[in-house]
Amino acid sequence: LTLPIGRAMCLGKVLRVGVKGLTGGHSGVEINKGRANANKVLAQTLRGLPLRLISIDGGSKDNAIPRASEAYLVSEDPKLPTMLKERWDAVRAALPTGETTVEFYCEEAQSDLLPMDWESSAYALELLNELPNGVQAMSADIEGLVQTSLNLGILETRADDVRMTFSVRSSVNAEKAALIETLRKLGARFGARYDESGEY
């Protein structure tokens, strides 16, 4: 999915905010172990807070569950670091029990890029939060076998868009097609383009 973004000047403090230390793993082999996806965790952390994204990036392979994700953002609200800490506590409590080494961080930073405009920033975070991820269906015939899943493996911000790359897997073609259609329709609601390459 490719989400076009606009950028606009904004006064405020630039911060670098991220999550690291998640377990990660291979999206085909370990998707059923309930491991947290850093891209989804960071988007959940930032949703609805008084900020505008500059960039949000995480992961380098579509078939690997990201262990870390990072955003540069700007905010005029001096209480944002406190709000982030409260949000981290809630997000940490909801993580799978095996995620014991996760770390959240927030520090002052600089960026050469203009922040996204309000709508682009809000759309990016809303879309990231609403996108499905992980196991979608288990096999009815073989106990413990994942039938259909997807993984948001790469999140990349460029000058004019945010690109979200998934690995979609299924042993049932109809389920895979339905899941891809869900991604396409959800992306279209926010003005994102869908394209695909490769097959699993």
Regions found by a protein language model. Name each.
Residues L145-Y200:
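Substrate-recognition/cap regions that form aromatic- and gly/pro-loop-enriched pockets
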Residues L1-R169:
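Midchain, well-structured core segments that form catalytic/ion-binding scaffolds
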